């Protein structure tokens, strides 16, 4: 019988907290914390470390990667919140500022497909632009993360 010990990296919680504070301060005023965007790099690094650690633990336990289980676990973790957030956000925009609904179909589709970052790049969107309203601009991070989730097991396999 193979016993698998699931490791928790408790120290990463503090690092994620520091990164989150840096990101929030950076978004409040880019001049306040000039390097605040490094918080995003920290989140990407931690996510990569945790995903690869999880995949390597599965391989070491003799189970293999288990592509189906891996992808289903990620989808179950991310999509329920997206499925709830998108209609709520669109509904609020309908009542508050309908200008925010310009291009909403493309935004919703690309968010759900995990390729919003490419849509934003292709449309020439600037993250801090005040001229082009976009309710889902912050989800570029989730799109990059979803793309990483898609590729990570293939990189190890």
Give the label of every model feature segment.
Residues 1-157:
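Membrane-interface helix/loop caps of multi-pass membrane proteins
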